[in-house]
């Protein structure tokens, strides 16, 4: 009780002191004079926090008048009338300056360019070495191997090369694989890659995110290491081992500052490289003449060319774009005027994009396409040329029309090196033809995946199709010798339910996300062994898989720290494969010590 009495006396004393303080300040203890109205009585004896002292006012610095020069003012608001000629000249001059900046920033390529002029920030002696090396490659004939033309289609489609003994033979070829090279070939993320077929060399050609072509002579003499430059090989070298043991690298700005979407070595003799990019062009780089030539291009920069493939003659190419178009380029003399055409086969929208196209090496009139609408389709291109089309105004015709001079009606003006399509068939025209009796054989087969289909490729024999899909599966479609693809009398059989479906399904994580290049399983072009393909694995391995769906080998070491999303194989050396990653680094794998 004594403690409670003492506490109560102390509390009353505190209340009295607080009331006296409020009275001295002229404040009502009940809060009636507060502008915020009454507030509930305090429930505790917490002391009121002390008010913070007001910050000291800083003296404003003296304003110093600075002559900022003339300011831009609106002539329209000021009511001034611009001099017509002077104003027009000024606008044209500003437009020219913007165009120059655009060309410089995009690194736009001319129609025909010398390779030496496409190399940037490289010493002259290294450019000469590159030119000499490419010309030495051109002197070596390396035609691509195709199925024998004497074999009938029905015999060729017999599935007799996937017996267990062939699978074991392939596994034996990939024994004792090891990492032979790990070199930064391009400055940016790898988008596409291929290996030249020359057996005595390992020439890897790499396309990156910004139109740069990396040329890697993996077995060539090492380049001298520049002074004060850190090692970027990425391999753990043994003590005393010389640096730069991984060949020579040259970098060429092959396209404008856009991703190189696809590359193919000239199938006739290996003396050049065909490539497409998001700058909407198809180009050919000749190793013998050392010139890069534009073969095909779109005026509309929104029509990104996603993929292409060549016919065995290398005189024709099929391309697919973002807006659902299939385009054809033909350089033969008889097709000079009509050799550039486009057909829109996908309806406009998110599913319009065609991400892949492949030409059947046994029957080149058949192509397969991979679409964002989840479908893989097989087309008979012989029917496409029967579809009605409209003339596409060329750049020259548009300029003439703007200047008041027009070409004759019904004719399409062309420049000496005009590469734009001359005719186009829109989606409604294509679908109308497809629904007509004449268009019965245009689409030979189709199959729908669970999600978008990223790629579709015919194997080197023309007997199977390999697809990659975002539904996390790789699929192999075997062609029946009695199907409509082989026998024209059975047209339409593969369009029936269950008429065309995968024979092998391999589960594979294809969720690359935003920052990795899309996975595309790629057939090996080597025809000395059973059909097999390579594909990057999200667990950072490079997988080799047979056409039967059996995993042959998964390649990985501690030195590989990124996913090899882009893969390729040496066409004539079965156990030599490469993988490329986001940093522009390429890993070369091979077995034994012969490399």
Curated annotation (Swiss-Prot):
Gene3D superfamilies: YVTN repeat-like/Quinoprotein amine dehydrogenase (2.130.10.10). InterPro entries: WD40/YVTN_repeat-like_dom_sf, WD40_repeat_CS, WD40_repeat_dom_sf, WD40_rpt, WD_repeat_DNA-damage-binding. Residues 417-426 have a biased composition (Basic and acidic residues). GO terms for biological process: DNA damage response; regulation of DNA damage checkpoint. Residues 47-60 have a biased composition (Basic residues). GO terms for molecular function: DNA binding. Residues 20-79, 397-429 are annotated as: Disordered. It comes from the Eukaryota. Keywords: DNA damage, DNA-binding, Repeat, WD repeat. DNA-binding protein that binds to both single- and double-stranded DNA. Binds preferentially to UV-damaged DNA. May be involved in DNA-metabolic processes. This is DNA damage-binding protein CMR1.
